[in-house]
């Protein structure tokens, strides 16, 4: 069987892209983890079922969306047959055989899929030309809003905004700004979550020059929702570092309204300080203007480790 699947600890872009691409490719959407509150809100809003949870690639044909890092995918990815990757991140894994690879430096994978649809080019990635239904357009719109933080993230491009407008028309969303705030509020509802749930909402692993680095992020409108849990979050990150072989873990508490992030730093603080040219006082530091893990956190850390 053939599956379209996003990364571990899936976000809205990962889930929405898997669902919509599977629709065009006539195969099955899947997920590699639990649905977060924001994605749950979006799926409920548009009346779409969550994808099947699968934990092994063995015996399956796999199409990856929204990632290409081996550390973010199936633990046994090599036991399946990788068919294609559709993404908006830097190139991660290497393959032993040629595959279809399509990526663009935009704010979300949903933008990539939407552009292919609107340019009548979905067949370029093996898809069938079908009408994009309102519920699926709503999923893609939600994913763009989520990944670009309602177009506030520095990863936002003109193409993201253009695709969002076109998708909103199909989805019947008359006010993107108002709808976007609904999504951001759902994204930032962390007050009822346990510290470990907050950590795992959006946590990704990276290999930087042979060192295991974890970068997590939670985006909030009201920082006070997570303030009282910071100490417990840090203790859990220390345990994670010790038990799972990390050299460094960075956890970003992103203040959507203030447009910056407090970084909790565990492990190799010297490498973090080298990457960002800052001094970590205690266990954290505020990074002014930093909202994107992909564009503003991963590149300087990777350069620091490779330097």
Curated annotation (Swiss-Prot):
List cystine links. none
What is written in the cofactor note of this entry?
Binds 2 manganese ions per subunit.
User: What does this protein need as cofactor?
Assistant: Mn(2+)
State where Mn(2+) 1 binds: 7, 11, 66
Q: Which Pfam families match?
A: DHH, DHHA2
- What EC numbers are recorded for this enzyme? 3.6.1.1
Molecular function terms in GO for this entry?
inorganic diphosphate phosphatase activity; manganese ion binding
Q: Which GO terms describe its cellular component?
A: cytoplasm
Residues where Mn(2+) 2 binds: 13, 66, 88, 147
Cellular localisation: Cytoplasm
Alphabetical list of SUPFAM superfamilies matching this protein: DHH phosphoesterases
Keywords on this record?
Cobalt, Cytoplasm, Hydrolase, Manganese, Metal-binding
Q: Does the keyword rRNA processing apply?
A: no
Q: Does the keyword Manganese apply?
A: yes
Query: What catalytic reaction does the record list?
Result: diphosphate + H2O = 2 phosphate + H(+)
InterPro entries reported for this sequence: DDH_dom, DHH_sf, DHHA2, DHHA2_dom_sf, Mn-dep_inorganic_PyrPase
The highest taxon in the source lineage is: Archaea
Which NCBIfam families does UniProt cross-reference here?
A: PRK05427.1 (NF003877)
Family that this chain belongs to: Belongs to the PPase class C family.
Q: Which HAMAP family match?
A: PPase_C
- PANTHER family in UniProt: BNIP - RELATED (PTHR12112), MANGANESE-DEPENDENT INORGANIC PYROPHOSPHATASE-RELATED (PTHR12112:SF22)
Q: What is this protein called?
A: Manganese-dependent inorganic pyrophosphatase
Specify the species.
Answer: Methanocaldococcus jannaschii (strain ATCC 43067 / DSM 2661 / JAL-1 / JCM 10045 / NBRC 100440)
The primary gene name is ppaC
């Amino acid at each position: 069987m053939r599956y379209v699947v996003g990364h571990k600890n899936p976000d809205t872009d990962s889930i929405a892209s898997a669902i919509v691409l599977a629709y065009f490719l006539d195969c099955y959407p899947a997920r590699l983890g639990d649905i977060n509150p924001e994605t749950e809100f979006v799926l409920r809003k548009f009346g779409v079922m969550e994808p099947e949870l699968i934990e092994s690639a063995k015996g399956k044909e796999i199409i990856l969306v929204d990632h290409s890092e081996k550390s973010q995918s199936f633990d046994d990815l090599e036991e399946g047959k990788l068919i294609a990757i559709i993404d908006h991140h830097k190139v991660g894994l290497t393959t032993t055989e040629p595959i279809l690879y399509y990526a663009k430096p935009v704010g979300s994978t949903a933008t990539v899929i939407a552009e292919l649809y609107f340019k009548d080019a979905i067949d370029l990635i093996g898809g069938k030309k079908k009408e994009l239904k309102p519920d699926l357009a709503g999923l893609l719109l939600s994913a763009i809003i989520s990944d670009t933080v309602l177009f506030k993230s520095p990863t936002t491009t003109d193409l993201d905004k253009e695709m969002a407008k076109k998708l909103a028309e199909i989805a019947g969303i008359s006010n993107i700004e108002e709808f976007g705030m609904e999504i951001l509020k759902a994204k930032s509802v962390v007050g009822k979550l346990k510290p470990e749930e907050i950590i795992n909402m959006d946590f990704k692993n990276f290999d930087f020059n042979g060192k295991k680095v974890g970068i997590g992020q939670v985006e909030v409108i009201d920082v006070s929702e997570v303030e009282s849990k910071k100490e417990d979050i840090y203790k859990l990150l220390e345990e994670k570092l010790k038990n799972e072989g990390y050299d460094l873990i960075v956890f970003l508490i992103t203040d959507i309204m203030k447009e910056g992030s407090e970084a909790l730093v565990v492990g190799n603080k010297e490498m973090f300080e080298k990457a960002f040219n800052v001094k970590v006082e205690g266990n954290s530091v505020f990074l002014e203007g930093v909202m994107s893990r992909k564009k503003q956190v991963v590149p300087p850390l990777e350069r620091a480790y490779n330097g």
